[in-house]
């Protein structure tokens, strides 16, 4: 016969094991009645979202409010994973230019209000000054900051730094990535004006050795677009995909058709990022491309000091352009969440799976008469515009436009 002592021990052990599960049922924050769009998990319906310890605990219909410490009613609003912007310049500092400079932007000033929870800096730092970038900006920001490491050692520190082939060292870039694998997601080539393909080849070698994607920003006449795409591997990313500048052939030909070699690159698995910026997005390229099936894989904004005050403005504005150009809202959200997460090999991001980090955007579609401007000063008109109502970063509220989470003032 089993002794009473053994039974007591067994019961105590069971209670010990069950206790954490019972405690975990207490919900820190419950988003009720929102329309969830989570492309990875194929959710597109009214759902509740429960958050515990900064992570997604449950996404389901009618989660009881009784165990929730805080409840936010998202009725009439959309709920999605936090948006991911894969082309930004956020190595802000006091120097002229971009690297540690005044032309970069402090990310928290512009991300939260746009529903953006993750940004990827596009080569503003190189292997020489990345540690400064990490200490000065990355580690001190609420926004998650990832990085495409510039093949140039000093990154975007000015023309002389960008032109120094001797400083474009694949081994040094590789060792930097090995040291910071949680932050550096790829290699960047861009802003080189020489006649040699060496920088491109060095960047590609660094990306291959590190098993990361290459972000290509080469709008130079000596780097023909077709040759760039031919050198790129499946999973590599070309940005400023829909620009119309004299320095680089556009993706649309004189007859208004997507060039055949561009279609082949798309079939090969090359990814196309918007990279809007101040000069990287033209309706004359983007609209026929969209109609002919050349869709962007991501809505990189090319966030910097000048683009925020021009036609780009913010990521929501870029997304709104595509919504008004005819892209379905579900496809827009895919390209702002799960698709960019996949492109940078961070599949822990961009979705609301159980256990995932609770980076969340709660947003609305405003109805009205709106104008949208491209890099050439051309305008289209639309009747819908995305607006961020609430942004959560690791389960914490970092933006609340209309006080959804606030207590009502009583006189």
Residue map of PLM features:
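Histidine-rich, glycine-flanked metal-binding segment
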Residues: 26-30, 36-82
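His/Asp/Glu-enriched, well-ordered alpha-helical/loop segment
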Residues: 284-369
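C-terminal cap of metal-dependent C-N hydrolases
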Residues: 34, 357-409
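Bacterial N-terminal signal peptides that target proteins for export
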Residues: 1-11
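Metal-associated gating/positioning segment near the N- to mid-region
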Residues: 74-139
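Metal-cofactor-binding active-site regions of metalloenzymes
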Residues: 114-120, 124-125, 140-165
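Active-site core of metal-dependent hydrolases
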Residues: 186-309
């Amino acid at each position: 016969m089993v002794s009473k002592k053994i039974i007591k021990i067994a019961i105590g052990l069971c209670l010990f094991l069950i206790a954490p599960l019972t405690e975990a049922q207490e919900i820190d924050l419950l988003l009720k009645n929102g329309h969830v769009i989570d492309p990875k998990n194929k959710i597109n319906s009214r759902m509740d979202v429960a958050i515990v310890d900064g992570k997604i605990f449950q996404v389901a219909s009618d989660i009881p409010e009784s165990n929730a410490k805080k409840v936010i009613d998202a009725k009439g609003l959309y709920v999605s994973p936090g948006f991911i912007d894969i082309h930004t310049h956020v190595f802000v500092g006091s120097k002229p230019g971009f690297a540690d400079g005044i032309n970069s932007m402090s990310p928290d000033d512009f991300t939260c209000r746009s529903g953006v929870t993750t940004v990827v800096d596009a080569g503003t730092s190189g292997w020489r000054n990345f540690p400064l970038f990490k200490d000065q900006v990355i580690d001190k920001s609420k926004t998650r900051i990832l990085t495409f490491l510039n093949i140039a050692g000093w990154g975007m520190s000015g023309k002389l730094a960008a032109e120094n082939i001797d400083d474009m060292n694949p081994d040094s870039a590789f060792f930097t990535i090995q040291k910071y694998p949680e932050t550096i997601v790829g290699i960047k080539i861009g802003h080189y004006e020489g006649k040699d393909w060496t920088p491109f080849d060095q960047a590609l070698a660094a990306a291959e050795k590190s098993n990361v994607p290459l972000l290509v920003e080469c709008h130079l006449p000596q780097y023909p677009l077709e040759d760039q795409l031919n050198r790129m591997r499946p999973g590599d990313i070309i940005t400023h995909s829909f620009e119309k500048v004299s320095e680089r052939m556009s993706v649309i030909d004189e007859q208004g058709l997507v060039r055949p070699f561009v279609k082949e690159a798309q079939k090969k698995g090359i990814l196309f990022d918007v990279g809007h910026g101040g000069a990287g997005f033209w309706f004359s390229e983007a609209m026929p491309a969209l109609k002919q099936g050349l869709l962007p894989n991501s809505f990189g904004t090319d966030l910097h000091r000048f683009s925020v005050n021009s036609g780009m403005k913010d990521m929501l504005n870029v997304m709104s352009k595509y919504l008004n150009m005819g892209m379905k809202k579900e496809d827009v959200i895919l390209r702002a969440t799960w698709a960019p997460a996949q492109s940078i090999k961070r599949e822990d991001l961009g979705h609301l799976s159980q256990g995932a980090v609770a980076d969340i955007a709660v947003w609305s579609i405003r109805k009205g008469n709106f104008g949208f401007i491209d890099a050439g000063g051309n305008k289209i008109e639309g009747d819908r515009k995305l607006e961020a109502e609430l942004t959560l970063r690791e389960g914490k509220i970092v933006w609340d436009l209309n006080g959804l989470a606030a207590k009502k003032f009583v006189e």
